[in-house]
């Protein structure tokens, strides 16, 4: 079904109005197509340059290589109560979304003149079912400086999708809530730009790169079960629950670039399609109260700013093809990771890397983390002043909390217990504040700092029943150790090695393995 004439539309959103499609079984019948292996496919429905469109209670079946339903330059549309099933399973070169939101441009949406760059706005996609297809809803192409706006995707059911359920490319003011996704390759993918498929209008004046971002997106109360690892088009597909990412177009040499299934290296040139080189961030995305399970990463954030992960439950299964992490952050700024509960996985619970250049601190607060194959929390080059507070971290196969190469970090009020390595370990972290933590029954030292973690404060902590010492300080100077309690540690209460302790007072020692409690080696302890 095609709406309208290919040449005579008024353009914008004024070409067609007040369209309703109610019911019907629309079978694309790909099995009857000869030479399916050749290039090309077909779209079931195409609607462009329209306002007030309703599609409801329809069933779409058996598509070949493309979209069941494609909207471009459409405002005020609802798609409700529809079912999308069946896709040629032998095709692995792409696997397009069942519902595609697009723009009126010649390379994106040909055959609907004028090509004025009109995008989709005010779209509701609700109470639909997607089964045995490649991908569900979203966009994989965009017009630079023209975001898709006011998109609501809620209460849909997705089952047995080889790729992602939802792709929000250059979306703003969007709500994704109440969806159930089972056995999907990926859950929800949010991305600022996609250089390889970004387009500009002829003569368009472009804003600076930094002005282009996806923002104000709420991802809430979704259930996502990630499928077993798979190969698609002979490439490994790394599954995920939620992936929030910006992009670095070429021209910023040496930066990490996000990868996706059909653009693994983001190899488009910096001037591809007229898009300026630069950093394109994701801003203001909140992922909260989602339930994520299965074999991929729980939540990933890359080149993100002012984003929140709150109250999510993540239950991962270990797989043999790649490592999976509860929450992973790379190159972020002002990221808040709060009140999440996560377990399983053969990598880290929370992994943060490369936020050191950010002017805004990151906060990891009141999360519960257990049963990961590496560290419960690992922060490398954390933003200066970053805070890790009041988390419960247990039964991980390495350390409870590991922080490396970070200044002025605050580690406060955490419970670390039954981890195979240290409870808390800081390496190369000057001016750290390690206060009021409880570290017990870990397989090594309760708290350890080393590698020039100078001028740090260790105060008010309780270290008990650890398999080695309660506290170990190595190769650091200007350290204060005051008001801590060391109880029933197997070796010493505290060890000071090649270090200078400026203050060591008001500490309490009870039944540690060595009666002298403190072991020193090549160290100086102030008598003050």
Task: Give each language-model segment a name.
Residues 1-22, 31-52, 68-74, 144, ...:
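Extracellular beta-strand-rich solenoid/capping regions of secreted or surface-exposed proteins
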Residues 61-144, 148-150:
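Solenoidal tandem-repeat scaffolds enriched in leucines and small polar residues
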Residues 17, 50-53, 71-77, 121, ...:
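Short "repeat-start/strand-capping" segments in structured domains, especially the N-termini
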Residues 30-36, 42-43, 64-71, 88-98, ...:
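Short glycine/acidic-rich loop motifs that flank beta-strands on beta-rich extracellular proteins
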Residues 477-528:
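Leucine-rich solenoid repeat scaffolds
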Residues 173, 180-266, 275-382, 387-394, ...:
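Core solenoid repeat modules with strong leucine/isoleucine-rich periodicity
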């Amino acid at each position: 079904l095609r709406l309208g004439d290919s040449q005579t539309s008024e353009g914008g959103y004024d070409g067609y109005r007040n369209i309703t499609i109610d019911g019907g079984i629309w079978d694309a019948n790909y099995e009857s197509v000869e030479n399916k292996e050749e290039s090309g496919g077909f779209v079931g429905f195409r609607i462009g340059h329209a306002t007030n469109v309703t599609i409801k209670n329809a069933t779409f079946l058996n598509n070949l290589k493309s979209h069941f339903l494609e909207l471009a330059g459409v405002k005020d549309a609802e798609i409700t109560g529809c079912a999308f099933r069946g896709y040629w399973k032998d095709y692995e070169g792409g696997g397009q979304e069942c519902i595609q939101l697009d723009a009126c441009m010649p390379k994106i949406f040909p055959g609907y003149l004028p090509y004025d760059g009109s995008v989709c706005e005010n779209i509701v996609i609700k109470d639909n079912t997607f089964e045995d297809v490649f991908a569900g809803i979203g966009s994989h192409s965009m017009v630079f400086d023209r975001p898709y706006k006011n998109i609501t995707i809620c209460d849909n059911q997705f089952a047995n999708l080889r790729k992602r359920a939802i792709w929000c490319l250059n979306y703003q003011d969007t709500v994704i809530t109440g969806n159930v996704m089972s056995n999907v390759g990926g859950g929800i993918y949010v991305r600022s730009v996609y250089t390889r498929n970004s387009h500009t209008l002829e003569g368009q004046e472009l804003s600076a790169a930094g002005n282009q971002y996806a923002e104000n997106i709420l991802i809430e109360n979704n259930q996502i079960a990630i499928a077993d690892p798979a190969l698609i088009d002979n490439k490994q597909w790394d599954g995920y629950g939620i992936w929030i990412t910006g992009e670095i177009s070429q021209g910023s040499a040496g930066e990490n670039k996000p990868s996706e299934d059909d653009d693994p290296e983001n190899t488009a040139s910096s001037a591809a399609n007229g898009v300026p080189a630069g950093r394109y961030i994701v801003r203001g995305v909140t992922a909260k109260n989602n339930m994520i399970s299965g074999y991929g990463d729980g939540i990933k954030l890359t080149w993100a700013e002012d984003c929140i992960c709150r109250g999510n439950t993540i239950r991962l299964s270990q797989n043999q093809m790649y490592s999976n992490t509860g929450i992973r952050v790379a190159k972020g700024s002002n990221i808040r990771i709060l009140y999440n509960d996560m377990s399983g996985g053969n990598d880290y619970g929370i992994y943060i890397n490369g936020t050191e250049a950010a002017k805004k601190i990151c906060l990891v607060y009141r999360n519960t983390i257990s049963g990961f194959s590496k560290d419960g929390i690992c922060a490398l080059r954390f933003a200066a002043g970053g805070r890790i507070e009041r988390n419960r971290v247990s039964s991980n196969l390495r350390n409870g909390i590991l922080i490396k190469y970070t200044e002025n970090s605050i580690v406060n009020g955490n419970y670390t217990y039954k981890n195979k390595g240290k409870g808390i370990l800081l390496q190369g972290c000057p001016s750290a504040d390690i206060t009021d933590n409880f570290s017990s029954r870990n397989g090594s030292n309760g708290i350890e700092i080393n590698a020039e973690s100078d001028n740090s404060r260790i105060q008010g902590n309780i270290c008990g029943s650890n398999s080695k010492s309660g506290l170990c300080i190595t190769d650091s100077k200007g350290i204060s150790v005051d008001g801590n309690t060391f109880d029933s540690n197997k070796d010493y209460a505290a060890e000071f090695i090649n270090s200078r302790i400026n203050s060591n007072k008001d500490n309490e020692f009870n039944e540690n393995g060595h009666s002298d409690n403190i072991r020193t080696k090549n160290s100086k302890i102030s008598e003050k």
